[in-house]
């Protein structure tokens, strides 16, 4: 298993190189002149040209990419064109709010989604199944920005129970985490139901029932572990999606996280911050997928890696 883990880590190198090239090209294809934005609206052509030279944007693209690559290999993500602070410092200030928002969203979404999926599978085609799948379809159909504004209007503006924006106390996490986790809970419910329906039809489940084992133990002890493998895969993908896909929710709730930083950086054409954030999100997805593969063996000891 250790050899498999090392091989997978080495396999990350070409993937990250490809991501670096694509990110660099994508960022430099964005419309707009970052030198003009950094210089300000009142700046004349001479000042803009000086800013362009200072930022290194007057160099050919291959030269800029080589500079970008060598800096990353040295652990230097560059300096923000807007704040003039190191990009690592900008990301460090925003990472924890996004991380904890993701954890809160994922926690309730997994618990609620798996519970609905298991209940829907056990009482397949019954009223619990219909109610559960209706909730799941509703969660997938409702856009995040619309759900966020609706929750904000009801619980913050009308009732005054919860704060509207910010991330100062645990109360600030409730509405954004509900908004961000709604679609994930819906996906988890549908995926868990599909996986459990297949498991409930297996021979070992019928054998356990024939031996007189209680239905709750049959479902939770024999069914849950075998149904978890595809569910864990989806869980890992959804966690990566939440960590890198909270842009809309962070913008709606004015959340001081990575998503809002990325939106602001795109608006200001802050190349170093955009490149660093997209690379960070890509690395997160890759590492989460690797972690999911490692969890397979813990869930099902029959799985071995070579």
Swiss-Prot record:
> So where does this one cross the membrane?
9-29, 99-119, 131-151, 169-189, 229-249, 279-299
Q: Does the keyword Transport apply?
A: yes
Sequence ranges on the Periplasmic membrane side: 30-98, 152-168, 250-278
Q: Report the record's Gene Ontology biological process terms.
A: transmembrane transport
Its placement in the membrane is given as: Multi-pass membrane protein
Q: Which residues lie on this side of the membrane: Cytoplasmic?
A: 1-8, 120-130, 190-228, 300-306
Keywords (A to Z) from UniProt: Cell inner membrane, Cell membrane, Membrane, Transmembrane, Transmembrane helix, Transport
User: Which Pfam family would be a valid example here?
Assistant: BPD_transp_1_N
Superkingdom assignment: Bacteria
- Annotated ranges, domain ABC transmembrane type-1: 95-292
Q: Where in the cell is it found?
A: Cell inner membrane
Name the principal localization, coarsely classed.
membrane
GO CC terms, sorted: plasma membrane
Glycoprotein as a keyword of this entry, yes or no, is no
What is this protein's function per UniProt? Answer: Part of the ABC transporter complex GsiABCD involved in glutathione import. Probably responsible for the translocation of the substrate across the membrane.
Instruction: Tell me its family.
Output: Belongs to the binding-protein-dependent transport system permease family.
The subunit field of the Swiss-Prot or TrEMBL record says: The complex is composed of two ATP-binding proteins (GsiA), two transmembrane proteins (GsiC and GsiD) and a solute-binding protein (GsiB).
Its recorded name reads Glutathione transport system permease protein GsiC
Q: Which organism is it from?
A: Pectobacterium atrosepticum (strain SCRI 1043 / ATCC BAA-672) (Erwinia carotovora subsp. atroseptica)
